[in-house]
Swiss-Prot record:
Annotated spans, Disordered: 358-404
Keyword annotations from UniProtKB, A to Z: Capsid protein, Helical capsid protein, Host cytoplasm, Phosphoprotein, Ribonucleoprotein, RNA-binding, Viral nucleoprotein, Virion
Name recorded for this polypeptide: Nucleoprotein
Gene this chain is encoded by: N
Higher taxonomy: Viruses, Riboviria, Orthornavirae, Negarnaviricota, Haploviricotina
Function: Encapsidates the genome, protecting it from nucleases. If expressed without protein P it binds non-specifically RNA and therefore can bind it's own mRNA. Interaction with protein P abolishes any non-specific RNA binding, and prevents phosphorylation. The soluble N-P complex encapsidates specifically the genomic RNA, with protein N protecting the genome like a pearl necklace. The encapsidated genomic RNA is termed the nucleocapsid (NC) and serves as template for viral transcription and replication. Protein N binds protein P in the NC through a different interaction, and can be phosphorylated.
Length: 404
């Protein structure tokens, strides 16, 4: 019987289990076709734009988005459109022009009517841009998280960005659900949103606004893992390559390779918009950087979180629970302690320290031997909230957090 079982299972050593279904695609702009909506606007077309703004979240959401995207990319001149298309083609993307909707039916559901009523000739462009950036967040937030963001954060944030009118952005659940259904990764309209955000980042006059309001930190693109890794290396005061050398372990090899690959790609980007193109790539499709999330690389992510937790617990509160076994948690905490001790040596036997430093080291040694060092924070909860440090952004407790 035993021989029969062995025969039945022979060859399984050559079968690789890949629960993620593949690593996913790496962003290669030349393989991506972006959409730019076009259609001339005249003075009499202002009503079409306002109607499109009103219609967001209703039955004509896609048509409305096409009008708004055409307006912000094209403006009132053909030269504006050509300049922005050149930004995208210079990055290597293929650009295809699509005809926008020509009208929006009056009288149908208008969920954003309250926002549209705040429009005038002076603020129209800024309101439309802010609205589109807000819509792009639906590629990273669930409907419930988006409603929380709108009700607790958007008004204050928009006011600091000079678009206080966005406090009237609807939080109606049916409208947000409709928007979320239209703005999904890989959709034609989502690729047009992606193109719009990249052109805004490339423009020095709007560049600073986009990180605050746009979908620049998407789940699963690996940027949280990169942020953890960079933060840990910085805290230890060592080069990234040295940290990877210290973490040499068979089960971490694949994760280390992903870190190196993504860091290299980001570092080789020639412009800020090229870096953000990588960070936002999940807007183009769920397959991008599919295995770069924290829980796809849970072991190295947990070790890195423990290292930085030795320095500042609150710097890691934005991370949701990283799934590792209790046994590995204990091991990771020990690895973090050993690494910190290695690079935070406070010795009194060196010939290149002053008497003051030597005496302080003696007292430090006595104190630490008298009481156990507290462990780094153990991230077991899946509801942790706080802030991340991957892009230099900071969020308060009312801001819906996300992790890769």
């Amino acid at each position: 019987m035993e021989g029969g079982i062995r025969a039945a299972f022979s060859g399984l050593n050559d079968v690789r289990i890949d629960p993620t279904g593949g690593e996913g695609r790496v962003l290669v702009p030349g393989e991506v076709e972006l959409i730019v909506y076009v259609g001339e606007f005249g003075e009499e077309d202002r009503k079409v734009i306002v109607d499109a703004l009103s219609a967001l979240g209703g039955p004509q959401t896609v048509q409305a988005l096409s009008v708004l995207l055409s307006y912000v990319l094209q403006g009132n001149t053909q030269e504006d459109l050509e300049t922005k298309c050149k930004v995208l083609t210079d990055m290597g993307f293929k650009v295809t022009q699509a005809v926008r909707a020509t009208s929006i039916e009056a009288g149908i559901m208008m969920p954003m009517r309250e926002l549209a009523l705040t429009v005038n000739d002076d603020n129209l462009m800024e309101i439309v841009k802010g609205t589109l950036m807000t819509c792009s967040l639906l590629t990273k937030y669930s409907v419930d998280k988006m409603i929380k963001y709108i009700t607790k954060k958007l008004g204050e944030l928009a006011d600091t960005q000079g678009v206080g009118e966005l406090q009237h952005f609807t939080a109606d659940k049916a409208a947000i659900r409709k928007l979320a259904g239209c703005v999904r990764p890989g959709q034609k309209i989502t690729k047009a949103l992606y193109a719009f955000i990249l052109t805004e980042i490339a423009d020095p006059t709007t560049q600073s606004r986009v990180p605050s309001m746009g979908a620049l930190r998407l789940n699963g693109t690996g940027m949280t893992m990169i942020g953890l890794f960079t933060q840990a290396a910085n805290n230890l005061g060592i080069a990234p390559a040295k940290l990877l050398e210290d973490l040499c372990m068979e089960s971490l090899v694949e994760s280390a390779r992903r870190i190196i690959q993504l860091m290299r790609q980001v570092s080789e980007a020639k412009s800020i918009q090229e870096r953000y193109a990588i960070m936002m790539s999940r807007m183009l499709g769920e397959s991008y950087y599919k295995s770069y999330g924290l829980n796809d690389n849970s072991k190295i992510s947990y070790i890195l979180s423990q290292i930085s937790g030795k320095y500042a617990v609150d710097s890691l509160e934005g991370l949701e629970g990283i799934k590792v076994t209790e046994k590995f948690r204990e091991f990771a905490e020990l690895v973090a302690e050993v690494l910190v001790d290695k690079y935070e040596r406070i010795g009194e036997d060196s010939t290149e320290v002053s008497d003051v430093i030597r005496e302080a080291a003696r007292q430090h040694a006595r104190r630490t031997s008298a009481k156990p060092e507290p462990k780094a924070r153990n991230f077991r909860s899946s509801t942790g909230r706080g802030r991340e440090q991957e892009t230099g952004e900071s969020d308060d407790d009312d801001y819906p957090e996300d992790s890769d």
